[in-house]
Amino acid sequence: LKQRVHLIFPMLRTIPNDTHASLAHEIDFDDLIKVKINGDPVIEYPFQFEHKGLLSYRSSATDGTEIMHQLFPSKDQPVFIDRVKILNTTDKSISIDIPKIEYEYETDKKNGVLGAYKIKVTSSKKGFYQLSPNEIFEYSLIYSARLSNAIEPYISVDFEFKKREELVSKTYSDLVFESPDKILNSFFTFAKLRAVESIFKTKGGLMHAPGGGRYYAAIWANDQAEYANPFFPFLGNLEGNESAINSFRHFARFINDEYKPIPSSIIAEGIDFWNAAGDRGDMAMIAYGAGRFAMAYGDKKTAKELWPLIEWCLEFCRKKINKDGVVASDSDELEGRFPAGDANLNTSSLYYDALISASLLGDELNKDKRLLDQYKFQATAIKNAIEKYFGAEMSGYKTYQYFKENLLLRAWIATPLTVDIFDRSEGTIDALFSKELWTEDGLASQANTDQLLKSILPFVELTDLQGHDGNDLEYIINLFMHPDLKKDSYSKTNFDDSNWEKVKLPGRLEKLFEGKEPSDGIYWFRKKVNISNTDNDYELTFED
């Protein structure tokens, strides 16, 4: 067994204090002093894994013992725990040597918003123990982080374990989804837990975060306002509901008389924002999510608080209606990783649903009937415009173009179905489950993406793109799929390369461009290959 622990502490902020400024640290299990059984370092051979809110696995060891691990984070402390049980399955007494494990790493104070941080690993027990046949010995490894000058808190492993069990048990038992498909049921259960355990107590209040190793202590118009927030009232999670209300409060801070877009993301515990992708249709996302949340939450006081934000976002979208009657935007939630044109299906569909929600919510709040009638009229108009502007036959299916110039099927043709627009439901469902979009891993974002992904994966693995902001894989796919082939640099074969810089391969890409002008991380190079015998197959290989 090779074990490596990757730790992220969202509330220990690093410099620069941006979207990705959570303290992160990786510890290889081999860096820790080994436990010994009968004088020999333990080597584990895992044979069973289980994930049910805790990652559990069982291993056999070379001496015939069995070892059980339960790994879990603390519910409310910057702590991660590896709870270990050693079972003597032999017919003889064994000796266990638990060394004094005290791994410490202190960060440079210049790199921390709050100064230096200390990351530590300790063992709950140490010393020599005798274990009789069928007896169990238990100890824990405790991974923690804190301000370097802060007092190290006492951690009760049993208490942390019970808090985690309680969270998992309640979340699993609330809003149970049952279908004939057990895998789908498990997906939904994991999604519930993923939602409730990703909420952080920040200086800007409770914030639900997308996570993914990079996105914490911040909110997004899509991940929070559109996705998670409308779900929390159905689950009934107290922290989830508060984080949703808090996120809408943060977005409402940016309401303005000039109708400039609300930022896509409010980051760094609420003290900064990110809007580098322009208007992604964020106001449609916020209006959609706030309306649905308010109706599901069922509290008039909260609904009244959210109403100005909903009303402002709807007016913003109305002002973005183009000559064809659909909502224009700079991009969509994929932020240019895939093309979205000047107006996309997702944004207009969300706007339609937000208008429907607002007309219903406004009626409950006794809002001006003339305004609510306008919302109903605008909803009918945008629904008709969606059919006229986006409705199309794509790859033989009566479905939608994701944007006007779109020639490939896209997964988000499903969005109209989620907002009760069923005019093209049959063709859309057939397209979603077609060979163009459906893969063994689920829906591809765009037709044929899966095949392209496989072809460029080695390139991705050999290229260091950690500096690129966003989903690097989809970003590269987009670049590969949509070069401007009309440009001479791509289309001509008799190019003059006399002024091209020669580089020696093999070599790491970052070494090739030292001292050059900054780039977006992508460089093109060309090689002309003459093939005389076209009856044979050839393979072109770039070797490192």
Where are the language model's segments positioned?
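An extended acidic
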Residues: L1-S60, P133, E165-V176, P180, ...
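Acidic/polar, glycine-enriched structural segments that form the non-catalytic walls/loops
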Residues: E50, T62-A218, K300-T302, D363-E364, ...
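Short beta-strands within extracellular/lumenal beta-sheet-rich domains
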Residues: T65-I67, E517-S532
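Aromatic-rich carbohydrate-recognition surfaces in CAZymes
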Residues: N88, L131-F137, Y216-D324, N344-Y352, ...
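Short, hydrophobic/aromatic beta-strand segments
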Residues: D91-K100, Y351, N536-T541
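Short amphipathic alpha-helical coiled-coil/interface segments
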Residues: F188, K192-A195, L372-F390
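Active-site core of glycosidic bond-cleaving carbohydrate-active enzymes
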Residues: W220-R249, K304, P308-E311, E315, ...
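Aromatic-lined ligand-binding clefts that engage carbohydrates, nucleic acids, or primary amines
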Residues: W500, G521, V529-D544
